[in-house]
């Protein structure tokens, strides 16, 4: 996909690149029915459109105060960070909560300037080697968070492609969790309903006095 998108940023070329990027993305996912494969394809498409090194889905819960990277796509040679970032301290990202509520993008273009206003956020991204970032929020039913691209090199002032990808991602997240809910209901039928708790944040768990079942346990059965 990246080889098919022009580097120039004039309005006409940017519009052409946008439509081309969407066409390539649609063609690559047209016959895909697996939700996780679709999310991976959307992340890849977003990263390639913006010339980014990495794209990820961050699900956030400010009541719990944590965020979790649930899906990630990395360019060849770029290390994955998903396993390292499974409990993001969301108190370090107050402006992200504001962006989610207002349905506005999050942009990092200058870490030094960001550090003057949001030092904790700047320190976090500096630690993980991210110098610039573009993120679009999503919020639907039980899912809320962001789709983000790290170190984008083009179209950084135009988040439309990322917003469209985020809308598609949240649809697939809802589909995944709906399927997990059906599986959970089947598994939970052998427990007393008053004794179980089902948690969907950052995955799926059935918690009871007899122990905990995860989404991976259910898939294995």
Give the ranges of each region predicted by the language model.
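Hydrophobic helical signal-relay modules used by sensory signaling proteins
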Residues: 17-29, 38, 49, 130, ...
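A short, aliphatic-rich beta-strand micro-motif
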Residues: 131-139
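Regulatory loop-to-helix N-cap segments in sensory/regulatory domains
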Residues: 2-13, 115-117, 145, 150-166, ...
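Flexible loop/coil segments at beta-strand boundaries within sensory signal-transduction domains
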Residues: 63, 138-144, 152
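Regulatory sensory and allosteric helical modules in signal-transduction proteins
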Residues: 77-116, 120-126, 134
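Helix-loop-beta substructure at the N-terminus of cytosolic sensory domains
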Residues: 28-70, 81, 176-180
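Signal-transmission linkers at sensory-effector interfaces
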Residues: 1-37, 175
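Intrinsically disordered, low-complexity protein-interaction/activation regions
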Residues: 178-221
């Amino acid at each position: 996909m990246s080889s098919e998108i022009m580097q120039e940023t004039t309005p006409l070329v940017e519009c052409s690149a946008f439509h081309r990027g969407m066409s390539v993305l649609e063609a690559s996912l047209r016959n895909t029915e697996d939700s996780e494969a679709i999310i991976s394809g959307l992340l890849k498409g977003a990263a390639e459109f913006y010339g980014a090194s990495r794209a990820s889905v961050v699900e956030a819960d400010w009541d719990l105060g944590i965020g979790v990277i649930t899906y990630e796509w990395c360019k060849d040679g770029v290390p994955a960070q998903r396993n390292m970032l499974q409990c993001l301290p969301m108190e370090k990202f107050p402006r992200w909560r504001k962006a989610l509520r207002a349905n506005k993008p999050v942009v990092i273009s200058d870490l030094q300037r960001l550090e003057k206003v949001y030092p904790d956020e700047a320190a976090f991204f500096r630690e993980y080697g991210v110098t610039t970032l573009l993120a679009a929020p999503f919020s639907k039913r039980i899912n809320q968070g962001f789709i983000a691209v790290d170190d984008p090199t083009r179209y950084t002032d135009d988040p439309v492609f990322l917003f469209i990808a985020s809308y598609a991602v949240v649809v697939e997240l809802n589909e995944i969790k709906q399927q997990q809910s059906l599986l959970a209901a089947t598994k939970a039928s052998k427990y007393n309903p008053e004794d179980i708790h089902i948690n969907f944040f950052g995955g799926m768990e059935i918690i009871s006095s007899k122990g905990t079942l995860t989404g991976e346990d259910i898939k294995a059965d």
